[in-house]
Amino acid sequence: LKGILGLTAHSTTIVGADWRKDYLTASSGNIEEHVYTLAAYAQHEMLLLKDLTATLGLRLTHHETFDNHLTPKATLMYAPGNLRFRATYSAGFRAPGLDELYYHYFSVNRGKPQIIFGNQELSPEKSHYLSLNAEYRSEVIAVSLTGYLNRINDMVVRQNINVDEAALTMLQREFPEMTADQAAKLERYSLYQNSDKGDVKGVQVNVSANVFRGFNLSANYVYTYARTKSGEAWTTLERSIRHAATIAANYHHTWGKYGLNVNLNGRLQSKTYYPDYEDAPGYGAWNLHTTHSLDYLKWAYLEPSIGIDNLFDRVDRRIDSSLRKYALYSPGRMLVIGLKVKFK
């Protein structure tokens, strides 16, 4: 439910409400859980001075388990000509997911057993987010620079716990389907817990350019420094990536009833952090795809496509072990072929 109102000149007011219900059903642990969330929100955007706009918002969230929470948001934007400067503050609330609360999970991946427990004693996360953004846009190029800081209290993290003799006995009792061989390979299990706080800060740069008609280049770079603290110790947030970039080039042209689209894109990233395991190494993976639009039939458009994923055959060839984690799962270079039919 959403309404957009013009209550005064040079302003826009948005009010609304939404309802959501989540379900978790799992045979492992005989789990059958559900929870609803109801929220009402209001946002008012107004012109303060020439090129200066303020936006104020408020959201009231009622969670079936974690009660009511009020979160404000404020943005100030100065927009002279092709430039945009924004400052944003927002408070956040996130209830633990049903998996984080109730998981009772056992699986075997690459021959390694994995166990994850939810925790019904979790508290919801509350956060304070601040960002500064500058943009330049023209018909040829767009450039955006954003710096952000997110402080999170009671951050939900997955703690890895070493398996001793007492823990192994407990785990075998909880998961009788686990074989003796699988139990012998089990070194850790995971439990969702609240850390004291989390700290995520970074910088993001976006650039896109229309080099000439039909040809576009874009690039994105993100630097992220993410940590979590329990007690006096700060640790790098599990699965965080310090440096990540995406690059894409796209060309499109039509000759009569034939259209060609060529897309080259790549993702490059530094290592993925796993504080209790071996970090997953960084990688660069490139894909080349072409799409061909054919308008030769009276009853349909045909769009055959052909491309290559992982163009340079990047593969993580490390020998597997119980401490090893992965970020690149590609088996290697792959030929991708498709056909789309659009009826007229």
Predicted regions and their residues:
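Conserved C-terminal beta-signal and adjacent last beta-strands/turns
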Residues: 87, 216, 222, 237-344
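Outer-membrane beta-barrel signature, preferentially recognizing the C-terminal barrel domain
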Residues: 79, 84, 91-152, 162-163, ...
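Residues on the lipid-exposed face of transmembrane beta-strands in outer-membrane beta-barrel proteins
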Residues: 1-5, 40-46, 74-78, 132-136, ...
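Outer-membrane beta-barrel strand-turn architecture
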Residues: 5-9, 46-50, 62, 70, ...
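Gram-negative outer-membrane beta-barrel transporters
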Residues: 9, 14, 47-54, 148-151, ...
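Transmembrane beta-barrel strands of outer-membrane/channel proteins
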Residues: 15-21, 56-60, 74-76, 87-91, ...
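Face-selective signature of the C-terminal outer-membrane beta-barrel domain
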Residues: 1-66, 72, 79, 144-147, ...
